[in-house]
A protein has these predicted regions:
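Tubulin/FtsZ superfamily GTPase core signature
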Residues: 1-130
Length: 130
């Protein structure tokens, strides 16, 4: 059985099509997933932070989520922030967001300053069958 970690690593590698690999601590990530849930889709955005305020804002509409998860109940949404370091993507922050009655809030990170000029935000949607 493929673990959630394996799925994430494979999806992100396939998405980027680069030499970068994803380093994720299994202990950090696994508690954010429901045991009966599964990942069905993810979205990725790159943010240029060079000479700009170090703040990251993610906005996801309910329509977009529903289009990604047709026929499934959304259990949880997980946001991962990756910082490029050499040929790796180091996970620097994450947030797990429960959806209640189809409500969805904006998630904002204060990233702090570093020498890299961009970060990537990966949005993972965990669902359970209806």
């Amino acid at each position: 059985m493929i673990s959630n970690i394996g799925i994430i690593k494979g999806l992100v590698r396939e998405f980027y099509q680069t030499r970068m690999v994803v380093r994720i601590d299994n202990d950090d990530l696994e508690p954010f997933f429901l045991t009966k849930g599964k990942l069905v889709a993810f979205d990725c955005e790159e943010f240029d932070l060079w000479n700009k305020p170090y703040k990251l804002v993610c906005k996801m509409t309910q329509d977009k989520l529903e289009s990604l998860c047709v026929g499934c109940k959304i259990a949880r949404v997980l946001f991962l922030v990756f910082q490029p370091t050499g040929h790796e993507l180091q996970m620097t922050d994450m947030e797990s967001l429960h959806l209640v009655n189809k409500s969805f809030e904006t998630v904002t990170w204060g990233i702090g300053s570093w020498h890299e000029d961009s970060v990537r935000l990966v949005t993972l949607v965990e669902v359970v069958s209806q």
